[in-house]
Amino acid sequence: MNEYEFEKYIANIHDVKIILDTYGVAIIPNILNEEETNEMNDGIWNTLEYLTSDWEKPINRNNTESWREMKYLYPKHSMLIQNWGIGHAQYIWNIRQNPKIVEIFANLWKCNNEDLLVSFDACSFH
């Protein structure tokens, strides 16, 4: 069977630190359920469409040609948006506060959930 490049980044809650230390990135599948994932995806699109609504060619989730306009949001490294207060978008807060996500970070940092602090700097997507 062919191995995809991303498969080496797959981790579980117990070995995520090893994968992060090795590759600098980790994927923990199946943390969010389908409803949570759909809400996240809608949140991303709602935010991008709102931010660009007054542009000559606004981003539209249903128009793949409009996706080229994302470059005008000035993503760093072709994926990281750090402007327009995007780090405070509601869908990002929903992800940050999801107990399943909090548990992963508390386990990673070996601390209590309530001892975690969050960052507000950016949104990353592929």
Give residue ranges: language-model regions.
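Non-heme Fe(II)-dependent double-stranded beta-helix
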Residues: M1-T22, P29-H126
